[in-house]
From Swiss-Prot:
<dbReference type="Pfam" id="PF00977">
    <property type="entry name" value="His_biosynth"/>
</dbReference>
<feature type="active site">
    <location>
        <position position="11"/>
    </location>
</feature>
<keyword id="KW-0028">Amino-acid biosynthesis</keyword>
<dbReference type="GO" id="GO:0005737">
    <property type="term" value="C:cytoplasm"/>
</dbReference>
<protein>
    <recommendedName>
        <fullName>Imidazole glycerol phosphate synthase subunit HisF</fullName>
        <ecNumber>4.3.2.10</ecNumber>
    </recommendedName>
</protein>
<keyword id="KW-0963">Cytoplasm</keyword>
<dbReference type="InterPro" id="IPR006062">
    <property type="entry name" value="His_biosynth"/>
</dbReference>
<comment type="similarity">
    <text>Belongs to the HisA/HisF family.</text>
</comment>
<dbReference type="GO" id="GO:0016829">
    <property type="term" value="F:lyase activity"/>
</dbReference>
<dbReference type="GO" id="GO:0000107">
    <property type="term" value="F:imidazoleglycerol-phosphate synthase activity"/>
</dbReference>
<dbReference type="GO" id="GO:0000105">
    <property type="term" value="P:L-histidine biosynthetic process"/>
</dbReference>
<dbReference type="InterPro" id="IPR011060">
    <property type="entry name" value="RibuloseP-bd_barrel"/>
</dbReference>
<comment type="subunit">
    <text>Heterodimer of HisH and HisF.</text>
</comment>
<comment type="pathway">
    <text>Amino-acid biosynthesis; L-histidine biosynthesis; L-histidine from 5-phospho-alpha-D-ribose 1-diphosphate: step 5/9.</text>
</comment>
<comment type="function">
    <text>IGPS catalyzes the conversion of PRFAR and glutamine to IGP, AICAR and glutamate. The HisF subunit catalyzes the cyclization activity that produces IGP and AICAR from PRFAR using the ammonia provided by the HisH subunit.</text>
</comment>
<dbReference type="InterPro" id="IPR013785">
    <property type="entry name" value="Aldolase_TIM"/>
</dbReference>
<dbReference type="InterPro" id="IPR050064">
    <property type="entry name" value="IGPS_HisA/HisF"/>
</dbReference>
Length: 258
């Protein structure tokens, strides 16, 4: 059995780490490199970086800080933000990223997934999915351009259908960003995760809602996800990654200990 992964998420805007609630009202957390060093020291398995306004601004992620991150850590990291071509992805990987993630650009052009997978291998291609539960319809819907409140909109894709589509096109890993739970710290949406797990045959990462160590345990034990991503509980030092891993190991979760 592969070890479960603990993954801090760093939303980046204008060269700084920020964090919002339900993808809105972002506050500045601090500089990228100091947080990166702290998470690596605490025992993070990998890191994910989202340049949250890149797609909405029609630009690609700033590569200068990617090189800075690669210089100071030796754990894998994934970068997302406005990647719309094979050439752009290759450049980001050349600066030191281990994986690239696409979200809104994949919705705009689903063939991008297969082109990237063909060029770099499926193990390198992550698709992020921003999913919102619409109480009126009772459905989970995929959202696009969520880094810009003025441009965020619901797409025609229902989440489970998009899950299957991106796998057909070559996604090697999925990150499910559960927008209703984001930043609220009331736990992951286990019902949605279980539904997605039934359709998802590649590694699945849960994102949105972690507030306690027990929430991570529930995601691993009850939804069988491969990794758990979180931001605010790590940024604000509510949970220490090393202590979280000790807790999970004591509960029988296969996890890499420092």
């Amino acid at each position: 059995m592969l070890a479960k992964r603990i993954i801090p998420c760093l939303d980046v805007r204008q060269g700084q780490v920020v964090k919002g609630v339900q993808f809105r009202n972002h506050e500045i957390i601090g500089g990228i490199v100091p947080l990166v060093c702290r998470y690596a020291e605490e025992g993070a398995d990998e890191l994910v970086f989202y340049d949250i306004t890149a797609s909405a601004d029609a630009r690609v992620v700033d590569k200068r800080w990617i090189a800075d991150v690669a210089e100071v850590i030796d754990i894998p990291f994934c970068v997302a933000g406005g990647i719309q071509s094979v050439a752009q992805a290759g450049e980001i990987l050349s600066y030191g990223a281990d994986k690239i993630s696409i979200n809104s650009p994949a919705l705009a052009d689903p063939t991008l997934i297969s082109r990237l997978a063909d060029r770099f291998g499926v193990q390198c291609i992550v698709v992020g999915i921003d999913t919102w539960f619409d109480a009126a319809s009772g459905r989970y819907q995929v959202n696009q351009y969520t880094g810009d409140e003025t441009r965020t909109h619901i797409t025609p894709w229902q989440t489970l259908d998009w899950i299957e589509e991106v796998q057909r096109r070559g996604a090697g890993e999925l990150v499910l960003n559960m927008m209703n739970q984001d930043g609220v710290r009331n736990g992951y949406d286990l019902m949605q995760l279980r539904q997605v797990r039934e359709r998802c045959h590649v590694p699945l990462i849960a994102s949105g809602g972690a507030g306690t160590m027990a929430h991570f345990l529930s995601a691993f034990r009850d939804a069988q996800v491969d990794g758990a991503l979180a931001a605010s509980v790590f940024h604000k030092q509510i949970i220490n990654i090393g202590e979280l891993k000790q807790f999970l190991a004591a509960e029988g979760v296969e996890i890499r200990l420092c």
